[in-house]
From Swiss-Prot:
Annotated keywords: 4Fe-4S, Chlorophyll, Chloroplast, Chromophore, Electron transport, Iron, Iron-sulfur, Magnesium, Membrane, Metal-binding, Oxidoreductase, Photosynthesis, Photosystem I, Plastid, Thylakoid, Transmembrane, Transmembrane helix, Transport
Subunit structure: The PsaA/B heterodimer binds the P700 chlorophyll special pair and subsequent electron acceptors. PSI consists of a core antenna complex that captures photons, and an electron transfer chain that converts photonic excitation into a charge separation. The eukaryotic PSI reaction center is composed of at least 11 subunits.
E.C. number(s) listed in UniProt: 1.97.1.12
Organism lineage string: Eukaryota, Rhodophyta, Bangiophyceae, Bangiales, Bangiaceae
Top EC group: oxidoreductase
A Pfam family annotated for this UniProt entry: PsaA_PsaB
Protein name from the UniProt record: Photosystem I P700 chlorophyll a apoprotein A1
Gene name in the database record: psaA
GO cellular component terms attached to this protein's record: chloroplast thylakoid membrane; photosystem I
Reaction catalysed by this enzyme: reduced [plastocyanin] + hnu + oxidized [2Fe-2S]-[ferredoxin] = oxidized [plastocyanin] + reduced [2Fe-2S]-[ferredoxin]
Amino acid sequence: MAISSKEQETKKVKISVDKNPVDTSFEKWAQPGHFSRTLAKGPRTTTWIWNLHADAHDFDSQTSSLEEVSRKIFSAHFGQLSVIFLWLSGMYFHGARFSNYVAWLSNPTGIKPSAQVVWPIVGQEILNGDVGGGFQGVQVTSGWFQLWRASGITTEFQLYCTAIGGLAMAALMLFAGWFHYHKAAPKLEWFQNVESMMNHHLAGLLGLGCLGWTGHQIHLSLPINKLLDSGVSPQEIPLPHEFLINRELMAQLYPSFSKGLVPFFTLNWAEYSDFLTFKGGLNPVTGGLWLSDTAHHHLALAVLFLAAGHMYRTNWGIGHSMKEILEAHKGPFTGNGHEGLYEILTTSWHAQLAINLAMMGSLSIIVAHHMYAMPPYPYIATDYPTQLSLFTHHMWIGGFCIVGAGAHASIFMVRDYNPAENYNNLRSSSRHRDAIVSHLNWVCIFLGFHSFGLYIHNDTMRALGRSQDMFSDTAIQLQPIFAQWVQSIHTLAPGNTAPNALATASYAFGGDIVSVGNKVAMMPISLGTADFLVHHIHAFTIHVTVLILVKGFLFSRNSRLIPDKANLGFRFPCDGPGRGGTCQVSGWDHVFLGLFWMYNSLSVAIFHFSWKMQSDVWGSVSPSGNVSHITGGNFAQSAITINGWLRDFLWAQASQVIQSYGSALSAYGLIFLAAHFVWAFSLMFLFSGRGYWQELIESIVWAHNKIKVAPAIQPRALSITQGRAVGVAHYLLGGIGTTWAFFLARIISVG
């Protein structure tokens, strides 16, 4: 195939910057609202403070220059990284200064992790519970101790050094953010050079990042963990640098080290299989993945990403062009296919962000599930409070990211989308949006009525004493046969479809019970009718969330009801009376509604996880091998009715948080109570009439005028949108706080 001269042309990569584009001025920054002419004039009404918060980070509203917006985002990313390094440094510092890490390291099954000792001011020292080893403190459930163990950290001094390193990196990032905005700001074409960006992120960030971590794991983590696993005390283990410079020391633990790099260059790579393993399953000593497996995994990823980082065409005429790849995509029903997509993704950061948030959100939810099915760090599997916390945390993060994807998709549609440039291509999926939305709606109605209907049927039959007519494992069975089939093929894989694996990828699928310190780390998770029922509730709530978000961005520019919606903007309360309902139709309102359904989805998912694990996985193992689970396997019979969920999960397991007063867990009792109040407070904003408050304010202002203490800034009721924002924020904050206290008080007591 002949290549035209146009295709051979490559965009020469130039580092192009503007020198000193923006002055560094503390005087300017000290003025509230300096980024907006209107806000800089100062407050006339109380609405000013709301607009200040709403617009401070809305760079689109501050300038129409894409280059300037790009620079602000780029600079803000360095600020974000600085905060992350500061937070990391704080975590490591707490580990070094206030924790019982070294004691935990010598007895990880008998001592609980703690890195916070509460000062006695008026009796708060009650919160310092006995975590074992003579240490009194607040039990932490973050998983840091297990991560440090996997990294090969054995002393507080190492934690101190890392904390100082984190501070140095935070300062460097802060400087970089200032430098690349005020001293040398990249030009727009630098931000739009996607091939270079892909190559650098794939090869540098992911490829070299994985390679660096592999090196750390092989040279430091593996030998130190091998010695710890075999019972050597942390004090007797050689210092980390000795493993780096003393090959004999390494060769005692991993004989292939004595051969150096000869096997690598002679392609006898199998020689290295003593530290790059493919075992599968879990380390029976720690209940975590084999660290030699994870080193091998990261090495493989490094190779993949380093190769991927050489795929895109830059200064040399070889490799892919992103625009050509996209425009080659043409399906039978999508007209010009992906034509125009390259222009969208290089000129709309909202479109980019929407895709990235959806991907990262989904990835976070995948991480949540892998953390318990394949526990990656030593002793994390038997630390039930940490397992529950990490699952819940990653589910929440994922949910917020996915709703954020819907938000930025709508903002893209309203602010950045140009219909003239997107005729007859894939982006005109808005042409068949009615089919998409009505099908989703039908799916939601079907799933909702059928999944809920199965529970209602069971509740009714149980109330009538007709247990033989219920859907259950002992009466009318609804077994999840496809899930059970997936479990069985994974269990049978080692030696068959995965010929080199010694054990299954996860014992959740089947196989042995792995116990550490007489506690279950992981075991086969049997699925039955109760799981089948609740999985259809998951399907229902997830599809409703998707319906709201997808309808939101597909109709964010126009609809039959409001054809000129794009002119009204991303958020507006209503579009006047007289045409049916024109309130709650903006892109923003769909995000608002989507957040509630995201909360519904995740609550059911984390409740399902918490109860299922306590009922069917977590528990103690007797010397004879009998397992007694925390709630004695009650999930299969109790979780098949609404009443069972209310009585045997919510009510039965809330006893610990409700009765926590006067114990080390009493803070959770207070948080449980306070978070309920925060949640109830949200309802005042969600069921509110704006006019009611404005009338009330007028009366209060009249009274102030009467006694001549009227404020200079005129009080205003919250706008409808502001009220909804305050409402949903407190609803979610209250809900998350309540769940946090409920879960932790329970699992710290019984786990």
